[in-house]
């Protein structure tokens, strides 16, 4: 193979469309742009989003102030009143709550909320805590740890 023998693959290149070179050439007269109107004239045509004077879609639709997250983080939620029945110094995790049948489903990482009261000290390990849950666990001489 020599440098002058290199050629593109057959069918990989396409000839450029030559317009305005006579009616018999196939693209003569109006050059494939139709009869009259803005799109047949020289220049850029209309801007993106222009709908011919009709109120465009992006102006018809209201501006949304807030929209929900696409993938919100799902937690398995438990309140402190459910943990009040556990014995003192128990280590509370998602697995231990499922095993003790305090929780029936696993919807994701464990989050402890502060509804209710606890009187026994517990060692709670969870992915998230509400501020009131942290205060109540600490007030009952327990410990909390975010994992």
Swiss-Prot record:
Question: Which one Pfam family would you cite for this protein?
Answer: Ribosomal_L27A
- Cystine residue pairs: none
Keyword Ribosomal protein part of the UniProt annotation: yes
Q: Where is the composition biased (Gly residues)?
A: 23-35
GO cellular component terms attached to this protein's record: cytosolic large ribosomal subunit
| Secreted among keywords | no
Q: Which UniProt keywords apply?
A: Ribonucleoprotein, Ribosomal protein, RNA-binding, rRNA-binding
What InterPro entries would the database entry show? Ribosomal_uL15, Ribosomal_uL15/eL18, Ribosomal_uL15/eL18_sf, Ribosomal_uL15_bac-type
Q: Where is this region: Disordered?
A: 1-55
MF annotations from Gene Ontology: rRNA binding; structural constituent of ribosome
Q: What does this protein do?
A: Binds to the 23S rRNA.
Which NCBIfam families does this chain map to? rplO_bact (TIGR01071)
What PANTHER family does UniProt report for this protein, alphabetically? 50S RIBOSOMAL PROTEIN L15, LARGE RIBOSOMAL SUBUNIT PROTEIN UL15M
| Family statement | Belongs to the universal ribosomal protein uL15 family.
Q: How does it assemble?
A: Part of the 50S ribosomal subunit.
Name of protein = Large ribosomal subunit protein uL15
What organism does the record attribute this protein to?
Microcystis aeruginosa (strain NIES-843 / IAM M-2473)
């Amino acid at each position: 193979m020599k440098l002058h023998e290199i050629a593109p693959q057959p069918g990989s290149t396409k000839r450029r469309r030559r317009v305005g070179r006579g009616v018999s050439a196939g693209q003569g007269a109006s050059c494939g742009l139709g009869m009259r109107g803005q799109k047949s004239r020289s220049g850029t045509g209309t801007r993106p989003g222009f709908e011919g004077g009709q109120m465009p879609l992006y102006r018809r639709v209201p501006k949304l102030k807030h929209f929900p997250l696409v993938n919100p983080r799902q937690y398995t939620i438990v309140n402190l009143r459910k943990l009040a029945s556990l014995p003192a110094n128990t280590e509370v995790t998602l697995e231990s709550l499922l095993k003790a049948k305090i929780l029936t489903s696993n919807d994701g990482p464990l989050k402890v909320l502060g509804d209710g009261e606890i009187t026994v000290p517990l060692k709670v390990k969870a992915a998230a805590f509400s501020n009131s849950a942290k205060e109540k666990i600490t007030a009952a001489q327990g410990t909390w740890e975010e994992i």
